[in-house]
């Protein structure tokens, strides 16, 4: 099982930052052609993405909204390229038919971002629109603007809706939207912990300094990992379908599934080694705009 905890956005028109991001501690890199790139730089960014893919780099791409001229150009360029990204994030997703068109054209996993009231209303339809839909998420800044909503709890219902739609469609738990207060790492931790409790897993980030916090929140604690190993070891040795464990807890298929997930997270954390040189304080001019 591949577990991605951190998804780092990097501007598509900055090859220097792309190279740094690919060498850094993020589990996944998203080269952005949308919000992080000015209109004047869109074509240069597109060429940079194609060149970097041709060099063998592995990363995800966020295209512009498919209904826009820039989005149409992004999809056409990636569809024609012989070297494909690992997947494509599709912003402003609202129409399942449009998402199907993008998936058919690209032939790689697609990740619709729901950023409007209509997108949230169509969450399950988007999540099940095509076999290549690999995950759904919220674009919270745009969604809040569309809803004219403010306050910390304003998006509680849409967040729950996305979690339910993703799991109903058999998709992974949604990735949390970016935390835009880059210097507020304590706030990032609190928000990410709340998101994980609510059914999100992993987070989009806009600076390497945010990555260690996200990874720490995503990691199961040692006691939980030990519990999972013990439970799965007993299952393998005894083959029991259900039992009462030593702590008096009834163990059935749902608990076993939870243990497998905990162990997958623990093993994923062991495979990723962060580079401290790439995760220092966040300077204002080293931030990707990804809302």
Residue ranges, per PLM feature:
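Expand to "…catalyze enediolate/carbanion chemistry for C-C bond making/breaking, isomerization
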Residues: 1-291
């Amino acid at each position: 099982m591949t577990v991605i905890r951190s998804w780092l956005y990097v501007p598509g028109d900055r090859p220097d930052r792309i190279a740094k991001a690919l060498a850094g501690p993020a589990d996944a890199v998203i080269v952005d052609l949308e919000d992080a790139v000015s209109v004047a730089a869109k074509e240069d960014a597109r060429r940079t993405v194609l060149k970097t893919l041709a060099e063998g780099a592995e990363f995800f791409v966020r295209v512009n909204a498919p209904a826009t001229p820039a989005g149409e150009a992004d999809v056409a360029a990636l569809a024609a390229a012989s070297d494909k990204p690992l997947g494509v994030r599709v912003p402003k997703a609202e129409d399942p038919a449009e998402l199907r068109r993008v998936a058919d054209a690209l032939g790689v996993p697609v990740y619709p971002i729901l950023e409007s009231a209509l997108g949230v209303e169509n969450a399950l339809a988007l999540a099940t629109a095509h076999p290549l839909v690999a995950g759904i998420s919220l674009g919270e800044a745009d969604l809040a603007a569309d809803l004219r909503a403010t306050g910390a709890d304003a998006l509680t219902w849409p967040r729950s809706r996305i979690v339910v739609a993703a799991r109903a469609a058999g998709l992974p738990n949604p990735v949390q939207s970016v935390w835009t207060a880059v210097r507020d790492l304590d706030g990032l931790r609190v928000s990410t912990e709340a998101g994980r409790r609510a059914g999100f897993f992993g987070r989009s980030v806009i600076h390497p300094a945010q990555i260690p916090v996200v990874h720490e929140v995503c990691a199961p604690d040692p006691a939980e990992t030990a519990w999972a190993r013990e439970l799965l070891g007993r299952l393998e040795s005894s083959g029991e379908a259900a039992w009462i464990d030593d702590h008096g807890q009834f163990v059935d298929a749902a608990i076993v599934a939870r243990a497998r997930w905990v162990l997958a997270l623990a093993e994923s954390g062991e495979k990723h080694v962060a580079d401290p040189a790439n995760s220092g304080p966040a300077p204002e001019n080293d931030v990707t705009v990804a809302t």
